Design a protein with these regions (language model features):
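Hydrophobic helix-coil surface modules that form long, contiguous segments used
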Residues: 44, 130-133, 141-304, 333, ...
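N-terminal, polar/Ser/Thr-rich
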Residues: 1-43, 68, 119-125, 145, ...
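Long, ordered, helix-rich scaffold segments
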Residues: 358, 388, 470-472, 485-487, ...
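Hydrophobic alpha-helical and helix-loop surface patches within well-folded domains
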Residues: 183, 214, 221-478, 482-485, ...
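A surface-exposed beta-strand-loop module
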Residues: 57, 62-119, 140-143, 182, ...
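Surface-exposed beta-strand/loop patches in extracellular or lumenal glycoproteins
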Residues: 47-63, 143, 151-158, 429, ...
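Glycine/proline-rich low-complexity spacer/linker segments in large multi-domain proteins
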Residues: 10-19, 101-152, 199-207, 541-567, ...
């Protein structure tokens, strides 16, 4: 079919930005009934002032019941199709004022104005999330990033509530049955960045001062009342202040949004969102038990990522979604860079190398890979591109660009970019222009090779040894565009590390700087050196490529990986080994044995957690059925041993405990250990509510937890997460009736919130529940289009990915794709990605047979 009117195209947006300039929105949102049982709608009144060169255009508003539309003092009959309000006979020589009043629904999908009822105390909370195009679920708007405007929010809310928006309060006054909160006018900004939150949130306050005392920024942290006791506001404020100090120095442009509030919200779809002055975060960043250092480092990274957006993304905004990567790669890069430069979390690039980069390599090797600069023709395509390429590959390539032009030049360019483009929109060409000025280099061929192609390069060491000495070392670079098959010769600025065994230590004997601009780059400095035991091609992780270890290096790594003193080097080698497992170039058993040997000696929490997760993935997906069950038992036993030898009370102990519980769900021999952990038998281990539920989940999956056991646990923890874990655990039991009911509810539109949808999927997808799930889900491929049509996109995505069948289904998926070529891009993209994962797993299972 044609493009639905809810789906704005790039051409329509381009046309609108040529003819329209928006002056300001005055938005009044009335949520006075929100705290009543079963409240479904709120009232929205928008007054938008704008000029236009043409008499006809449209405003965006989704799913509204329109009460009135007034155009320049004249009430008109609304011409509205559920997503666009058509406007005619507008003034082309003076300003227009359009006033729209409408009723709109509260959402339960985490987009628009989300309404949540806290099971702990019955309190109601509201918050908004608009990226990419959901401000139109709350007010009438020209919904595109380059039509910036000043926004003036008023919110009428129940009297006991706290209300926040992008700016500070100007006034609060009595209204019938409530209070009117009048917020200050915002600077010029994109509408997807506007935000409000309302409810009985608890608030913490602090203030940041610049070093010379000339500037101060009021800081706030908000969270639900039932979570407030767990909010470690001192740590969060500390990181926030360190970040503001760092960015003021690095960007040399004062924070432009007045105050800085950070709010933790329930049932949130993402990690966080950079609404200026009111940054939203998932509540997963608030820990109800001890947080490991890698969790704190991860949260720090996110806080600093969002803060970077205050300049890059909010102050200067990508003109359209094809430059989404501009802001995301930059923020992702800055999250790690600022962690290292401004906080105690100096290990950020190690965590990036072992975690985020794996996401990039996975995404970039799927059939759906796309260039970093993607071709985004409409909003539907934009939604699909919040992915591992836009974020993680983008940041890796930006890190390579910094290595290529120099860090001072990079920040110099950023400063000019903010200064000269403040409060406007920009494209890739703008950023590159500033980078070329700052570095004095022509970057056009670099941009073409890196940003307009797909797939990672493969880098291999080619080593000739004579009499124990290197006669020649070269790096062979296989640089192919995954989509076209053409050679693209991506240039690399990198370092090659030569490592030698001294006892059990793997010591870096030499580090060589190398630029690669051809298929084979000789490493001249290596000639005449003693033969290395391991060659780390991308040492210090400056570039983005799949580097291989070669036969000698792989052997050394498998036996001596923990002998590497530098955490970043260990992270890189683990990542290289994992890439080989995924590519069916290294046997799973070799990887498992290496993990058994080295993970008990691993001291970096992020590396340990990632390796243990990947090990479980390898057992479940890449081993043939014939050996999987034995491997599950063996790995669960190793996990409990790892827990036993870890230091009581340490982060590493928590990671081993989580790993042991994750593996126990598939190992009947682990029942006693799991019960013991639940009863507090593990010395030094704090068993918080999350870990209790993880234990119950394992017992439930093994058929060793009754509904009564799980109900009793819910009584202990009647909270948002408690309710979701309870649903998952009830479904995980080998009880066909419970599983059928969960499946039925999943497939009923409007039945579940986003979080409960995931809980049921988790409960159905336990390793031992595979057969029952396959029976329930046998019509998956027949039902795909129906799912896509019946559910809002956030839910449809969860179902398409979450219910994709296990096993050898690549061929069935191929048949579906071949016979559904007219299905929407969003749906086919997800099926292709699951199909690719299934096919990769089939190849690996054959290889490991």
């Amino acid at each position: 079919g044609g493009v639905s009117s809810t789906n704005l195209t790039r051409e329509e947006a381009r046309h609108r930005s040529e003819i329209i300039k928006v002056e300001r929105y005055h938005v009044r949102i009335d949520v006075r009934g929100a705290d009543a049982d079963g409240a479904t709608h709120f009232t929205s009144n928008t007054r938008v002032r704008f000029s236009t060169k043409e008499p006809d255009t449209f405003l965006d508003l989704l799913d509204g019941e329109i009460e009135s539309v007034i155009v320049n003092d004249e009430e008109i009959e609304p011409e509205y199709d559920g997503s666009r309000i058509q406007l005619h006979r507008l003034h082309t020589h003076r300003k227009n004022l359009v006033i729209v009043t409408a009723k709109l629904p509260y959402q339960h999908t985490g987009q628009g104005l989300h309404r949540f009822v806290d099971p702990a105390d019955g309190k109601v909370y509201l918050y908004t999330h608009f990226e990419a195009a959901d401000s139109r679920r709350v007010y009438s708007v020209f919904e595109q990033p380059d039509l910036k405007a000043h926004v003036d929010f008023d919110v009428i809310a129940p009297s006991g509530w706290r209300v926040a928006s992008n700016q500070v309060h100007e006034d609060i006054r009595e209204e019938e049955n409530g209070l009117l909160h009048d917020f200050a006018l915002t600077p010029r900004m994109s509408t997807y960045l506007t935000a409000i939150a309302a409810g009985p949130y608890v608030r913490f306050d602090d203030e940041w001062h610049s070093r010379d005392g000339s500037e101060s920024i009021p800081l706030g942290i908000l969270a639900r009342a039932s979570l407030a006791e767990y909010v470690d506001h001192e740590e969060i404020f500390k990181i926030t202040k360190q970040g503001l100090t760092f960015y003021h120095r690095a960007f040399d442009y004062p924070y432009p949004w007045g105050k800085y509030d950070q709010i933790f919200v329930p049932e949130y779809n993402l990690g966080a969102m950079e609404n200026p002055g009111l940054v939203t975060f998932t509540e997963n960043y608030i820990h109800r038990g001890p947080a490991t250092r890698s969790e704190l480092a991860g949260r720090t990274n996110t806080i600093l990522h969002e803060m970077a957006h205050m300049w890059f993304g909010d102050l200067v905004t990508p003109k359209w979604w094809d430059d989404l990567w501009l802001k995301e790669s930059f923020a992702e890069y800055m999250g790690a860079h600022a962690s290292v430069a401004g906080t105690e979390y100096r290990e950020a690039w190690t965590n990036f190398a072992v975690g985020r980069k794996a996401w990039a390599y996975t995404a970039d090797q799927q059939s759906t890979t796309h260039p970093i600069v993607a071709d985004i023709v409409d909003l539907e395509a934009a939604r699909q591109n919040f992915d591992g390429i836009t974020y993680a590959k983008g940041a890796s390539v930006l890190k390579q660009l910094v290595a290529h032009v120099g860090v001072e030049q990079f920040f110099g360019a950023a400063r000019r970019y903010f200064r000269e483009l403040a409060f406007s929109s920009a494209t890739l060409d703008d950023l590159i222009r500033y980078l070329e000025k700052a570095s004095g280099r022509d970057l056009s061929s670099w941009v073409d090779a890196w940003l307009k192609t797909t797939g990672p390069d493969v880098l291999l060491p080619e080593l000739t040894i004579r009499d124990g000495v290197v006669s020649e070392l070269a790096v062979v670079c296989d640089s192919v565009d995954a989509r076209t098959g053409r050679n693209v010769n991506r240039p690399h600025t990198l370092r090659v590390g030569l490592y030698s065994l001294r006892g059990d230590d793997l010591v870096r004997a030499d580090l060589v700087d190398l630029t690669i601009s051809s298929p084979r780059a000789p490493v001249r400095e290596a000639a005449g050196k003693p033969a290395p035991d391991l060659i780390l091609i991308n040492d210090d992780d400056l570039t983005y490529a799949k580097a291989r270890l070669g036969a000698t290096g792989t052997k050394t790594a498998l036996s001596h990986l923990s002998g590497l003193a530098e955490p970043l080097a260990r992270a890189l080698v683990w990542s290289m080994l994992w890439n080989c497992v995924r590519d069916a170039k290294l046997k799973v058993q070799n990887y498992l044995d290496a993990a058994a040997l080295h993970s008990p000696k691993e001291t970096e929490p992020a590396i340990l957690a990632t390796v243990l997760q990947q090990l479980q993935m390898a057992v479940e997906n890449y081993l043939p059925d014939s050996t999987r069950e034995d491997a599950r038992r063996a790995e669960a036993a190793r996990a409990w041993r790892g827990l036993d030898v870890s230091e009581p009370g340490s982060d590493l102990q928590r990671i081993w405990a989580r790993h042991a519980l994750a593996l126990s769900a598939a190992d009947p021999d682990s029942v006693e250990r799991t019960r013991g952990l639940l009863d507090g038998d593990v010395t030094g281990l704090v068993v918080d509510p999350e870990m209790r539920w993880q234990s119950w989940m394992a017992l439930a999956a093994l058929g060793r937890a009754s509904a009564e056991d799980l109900d009793a646990e819910l009584e202990r923890d009647r909270t948002k997460t408690g309710v979701a874990h309870h649903m998952a655990a009830l479904t995980a039991r080998p009880d066909d009736v419970a599983k059928q009911e969960a499946y039925r509810r999943l497939r009923t539109p409007g039945e579940l919130s986003n979080e409960h949808c995931l809980a049921y999927i988790d409960g159905l997808r336990t390793p031992l529940g595979v057969e029952t799930f396959a029976d329930l889900n046998s019509s998956y491929f027949d039902d795909l289009e129906q799912i896509w049509q019946e559910f809002p996109i956030e839910m449809a995505q969860r179902l398409v990915v979450g219910l994709f069948p296990d096993g050898d289904v690549a061929e069935i998926a191929d048949r579906w794709l071949a016979s559904h070529q007219s299905a929407t891009g969003g749906l086919t993209r997800m099926v292709k990605e699951r199909r690719d994962a299934a096919s990769r797993a089939e190849t690996a299972r054959d290889f490991n047979n």
